[in-house]
Regions:
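Fe-S-dependent hydro-lyases/dehydratases of central metabolism
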Residues: 1-198
Length: 198
């Protein structure tokens, strides 16, 4: 969202974004997938991270460590532009209607009542993301005036969340679990409420 705020939905046209640096090195593969997936919102040709130790650990957890190959930028690589993001200074952001680059600090919109909540998608529905949401909902109920849905990114993640009890926590709170497919992101299955805030 910070990149969208800075360069807009057309800022990436004809560009490949490569994310690197000390902050990027700490991100696990699902977090990196969220960022690279959102390159489409920037209009980017593609987005990449180095295939480093984090990638090796992820592939090992998937039983595919033997397929891992380190892929790092050349030491003398040249770039058209370098954009520095200080991850420690970022504040929570939210994309507002009607384009993904209409980005506002959460502090500007946190008092607005919402009628719809959508957790997940292929972009940010990793095990850790959904488990955190489930723990927030544990012992609580979705407000009667709110439609709350959750989409999980993969069958593997869905099964692990189910086995570990996180889907039950969400369902007990009144969250509707969607099928593993495209959905609310492209306006399928959760039509925004008239005059509502989603």
């Amino acid at each position: 969202l910070e990149m969208l705020r800075r360069v807009s939905i057309k800022g990436g046209l004809g560009n490949v974004y490569e994310y690197a640096g000390p902050g990027a090195a700490t991100l696990e593969v699902p977090q990196r997938a969220t960022i690279t997936n959102m390159g489409a919102e920037l209009g980017a040709t593609t987005s990449i991270f180095p295939a480093d130790e984090q990638v090796r650990k992820f592939m090992k957890s998937q039983g595919r460590e033997d397929e891992y190959r380190e892929l790092l930028p050349d030491e003398d690589a040249e770039y058209d532009e370098v954009i520095d993001l200080d991850l420690s200074s970022l504040q929570p952001l939210v994309a507002c209607p009607h384009q993904p680059d209409n980005v506002k600090p959460l502090s500007e919109v946190e008092k607005l009542p919402v009628q719809q909540v959508f957790i997940g998608s292929c972009t940010n529905a990793s095990y850790a993301d959904i488990a955190k949401a489930a723990l927030v909902f544990k012992g609580h109920k979705v407000n009667d005036n709110v439609s709350c849905t959750c989409a999980i990114a993969s069958r593997q993640t869905y099964k692990a969340l189910m086995e570990d009890g996180y889907l039950g926590m969400l369902m007990d709170a009144g969250v509707r679990i969607l099928e593993i497919a495209c959905g609310p992101c492209c306006a399928i299955g959760q039509t925004p409420a008239t005059e509502g805030i989603a």
